[in-house]
Amino acid sequence: MSNRKSLTMIVAGLSTALALTACSKTVDAVTFPTASISNVAYSEQEAKQLPSDGTITEAGVYKVSGNVTKPITVNAPKDASVVLRLDGATINSTVSIKQAGDVVLYVAGDSSISSTDGHGVDSKSNLTIDGPGKLTVTSKDKDAIHSDENLTVTGGTLEISAGDDGLKAVKNLTIDGGTMNVSKSNEALEALNVTINNGTVTTHSTDDGVNASLDDGLADQNATPSITINGGMVVGIGSGGMPQTPTVGQGWVQQNVTVKAQDRVKVTDSNDAEVVTLTAEKAATSLFVSTPQITEG
């Protein structure tokens, strides 16, 4: 294994094991466009009020705040750019994006989305999450955040709990910034191509922390799944049924561990400087850590 640096893992217990998994199928690669949002104002002054029935049918910035009990649905023209400006919103149903060009969840203030019978966010369009605030997304049985197209995170603090996958995109899942904690999931991050360029990602999963696969029938079956970490800090823990590490990107270390629920694990470098300390939510057997400071040697 390349790009590895000696790290001491003190297993008084930890929760980390981004079981990185990629499908072994090797075929011609395909490139999908990433979400592109431009000339859209995110300010509160420019934002419209959410329609009373919760259905958005045209482009624009929409303010969502307070307790929202009706489903929020975006069903706009295919070329429409829609921004949902979440500011102190408590949304007690699925946010359903049926059609639009690109959609942004801009997290201006602490907000939450909770669903008991569907995905927390269910998008059939390109979806981007950004903003300075905190967003908590909970799905009892399904994915917390799901996109049939591309899913990009560029900012915000995300607290994710899912009955199935934490963040799932059929095509590309890209993390360009922000802080993300997937506290409960089957697979924390899943897409055809998973790329992490910046930010802090912590995962707790019963299966794979990061899974790049063709499992979803909507994915292009001629594509090659890939996992790339170019920056930021990624720490994960899980059972790691098919642990596979990134083929390109920054340095990483992966270690088999025996960790019980509520154990703590401290990871230090060769100079005894702390890299990360976490508490395991559940028993785990695999620990993965990737940071820009990890180099070969």
Predicted regions, residues:
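N-terminal secretory signal peptides that target proteins for export/translocation
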Residues: 1-3
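A composition-driven surface/loop motif
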Residues: 5-297
